[in-house]
Each structure stands twice: as C-alpha cells, then as structure tokens.
Amino acid sequence: MNQAKPSTLTFWKITAALSQALLWLAVACWVMFGLAWMALHWVIVPRIGEFRPRLEIEVSKVAGVPVRIGEITATSVGIIPSFELKNVVLLDEAGREALKLPRILAAVSPASLLQLSVEQILIEAPELAIRRDVNGKLTVAGLDMSKDDRNSGGAADWFFSQPEFVVRNGLVHWVDEMPNGTLAAPPPLTLSQVDFVSRNPLNKHELRLDATPPAVWGERFSLRGLFVQSLLSTNKGKFKDWTGEVFADFAKIDVSEISRYVQLNGQSGKGVGTMKAWTSITKGNWTSTTADVSLAQVDATLGKGLQPLALQSMSGRLVGRKLNQGFEASTQNLQFQTQDGLRWPGGNLLYSQTNPSQKLTKTPTGDVETADPTQAIHDFKADKLDLAVISLIANKIPLGAATHELLTSLAPQGTVETITAHWRGYLDAPTALTAKGLIKGVQI
C-alpha cells in the first residue's frame, strides 16, 4: 500500500491550520464589527449629549484652538447614524468668537469610528472672515495664520483624512487693509453662495469650490483640484507630497476688478470675458499653467515705462511652464485686434530661457549663489508674425529699448511666416546669435 510522504502530510496539516485560522479571523472581524455597530446605536447615539464635553476637548486638540459646541443631537435611521451640531464656535487667543458655524451634520459608521473619522461632514451657511492688515498679517476667522503653529499640520492631516467634507451656501468676506502697489487698499470683497466639497478616497484628494462674486466682478465661478500622493504617506495634509492639477472656470470675469486685489509688478489691466485655466502641481510645486482666454476691451500695462496696450478683443491659449533651470512661455492661436483696427492673424509663439548654473561667490557678508546672466540661453520660435502690428505696439510690449528704437525707426511691414532664433546673453547685446526664417512682403 502506498503511504503519503511525511512532507506531504505536513503541508496539508499546515494548509488546514491556516485555513481554520483565517476562518476564525474573518468571524472575529465580523463579530467586532457587529459589536461596534451595536455600541454605536445602543450606547453612543442615545447618550450623545453626555459626550459633548469630551468631544469639545478632542476637537480642540485637532483644531489647535478652543472649540465650543452649543448643542449636539443624534438620529439613528438605517445603518449609519447622523449627528447634528448647532452653534459651534471657535475662539481666538483672547477668548473671542473667531468663527461661528450655525449647523453641522455628521454621519459616522463603525469603520469610521475605528479610524477616528466620520463618513461625511456637512456644514450649512457658515460665515467666514479673512483679513490682511496693513503690515501683511493674515488672519482667518480671527486666527493668526502667520504663526508657525505645529497644530496646523495635525488639523490638515485630520481634514484631508475625512472621506467627505461638504460646505453649502457659505459666505466669505475678504478684507485687505494692505496697499496694493501704488493703489490704496481695495474695498472689502464678499463671496456668496459658497459651496465646497472635499473627497479623500485612499491616496486621492478631490476638491471643488463654487462661489458667486459681486455682480461687477462677473458670474459664478468654479475651482476644482484633483491630487494624488503616495500610499505610504502618513501626512494626508502635507501639500509637498501632492501631485495633480487645479482647474479654474470663469464664465464671465472683469479683469479690472481682479487688478484691484491682485497686481503684478505694480501694473494693472482691464478686460471682460471668459477664462479657463489648468495649473499642474508636482510634489507641491507649480510646474505649468495653461489658460484659454477670450476678452474684450483689453487695456493692460505689461511693464514699467511701457505705454498701455489697448485691444478691442483678444483670444487664444497662453502657456507658462517651469523648466529645470528656467522657464518657457508660449501662445497658441493667439488672435487680437487693436483699437486702430489692425488684426493679429492668430500665430503661435514660443520663448524659453535656460539659466546657467549658480556658483558660490565670496562676499564680505558670506558666500552667495550667483549666476552670470550673459550666459543664459534663449530660444524663440514663431509663425505668422505681422510686422506692421508689431511695429505699432512695439513700445507697449517688453522687447527692450534697442528693439523698440529699431522697430520705431524702420516701421517694417510684411509677414514672418516662420522664424527660429537662438542667442546667449541679453537680447539687446547677445554674445552669440543665430536666426533663420521666412519673410514675405517686407517693406521698410
């Protein structure tokens, strides 16, 4: 008679033991889940009011500021119970009300309790004030955001660990007391009907904000973000671990109103129209932005000492991208019409700058990293350039003094079908230059 080998018998014994252990483990998990569910519905829900002081303490630890809860009730309908909190107040360092939330709804489950989270948080009709004083100090709901608060990281981790966080019909006030360049501080701005959703499944973060600005600003706009981070990351709120894209959709916007609050190099602009923009983020750092714009009555100053550029209309795609040691800017199908009736035919442009590596330079105050700008490498590609239009607007765009004088004196006409240029150093005085292209109908 054939007998099973000892090794074979050992294998089957181990397999049977493991199977039995896994079965008992599965049963134990279901039993624990059932006990947690019963404890939730039979112990916590009926006595939720007794947990209010303890809940205030735990929430205060997470938020990093004192939190007071006026009232808390629980409703057990179906598998997942819901909790309602009223008159939730966050206090500042002086004990004053920094933020008041009239009504908060929270749904929990046994699984979320084991993770110290909730299934969903819904906040209705909150009102938030954001202020920047004359010294640049930023406060949100009366809380100083300029402080290096160690608790802020824990609060962000907790927030972005919640499966779903929803805000409906909120009100946000932005008060800026700091002068904007050469202009006085702008008037307060209020965003109404603010809706916000944050979903955080596994290692993803899905964000959406919709808000209605004042009528003079334009129409309701939408901001959306989709990010991922490593599954091994233990800090869900650490933005430096996030990689993804932000999308902005403005159905109608008045650039002149934005210029009162956001100003670049002390310059301002005007224009009414639509804009969509996509911004890419890698490990918390900006990498590129693509914007589709369609504006009318454009009036912008593009640099110090330049005349305003006035256009009847402008449309096309604008792209900015960060390189390893420089940047790249381009346009696609850019079209515009000047106030004099001249039309830009809709060509494409691409400009890139690669900066030289920085070197340590000894100074009286210590070693400083510097780079020689005369060694910077520049590349330019374009097609369908109307020389007459360029000549007309030359003193309104940042081309350099020498280029301005040359175009003004020559007043060229014609079309550059294609052009490619490569140079090193400053455009006014390059140390090396190569260029080639095709020009039609040139007149000087």
Which sequence ranges carry the predicted segments?
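N-terminal type II signal-anchor transmembrane helix
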Residues: 2-63, 128, 385
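Secondary-structure transition motifs
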Residues: 2-13, 65-66, 82, 87-200, ...
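Short extracytoplasmic
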Residues: 58-86
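Short, proline-centered helix/strand-breaking motifs
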Residues: 59, 252-257
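Outer-membrane beta-barrel proteins
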Residues: 108-112, 231, 279-283, 355-357, ...
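Transmembrane beta-barrel strands of outer-membrane/channel proteins
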Residues: 123, 248-250, 293-295, 382, ...
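Solvent-exposed beta-strand/coil patches in large extracellular/periplasmic or lumenal scaffold regions
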Residues: 142-181, 194, 199-214, 276-283, ...
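Short coil-to-beta-strand
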Residues: 241-251, 291, 378-380
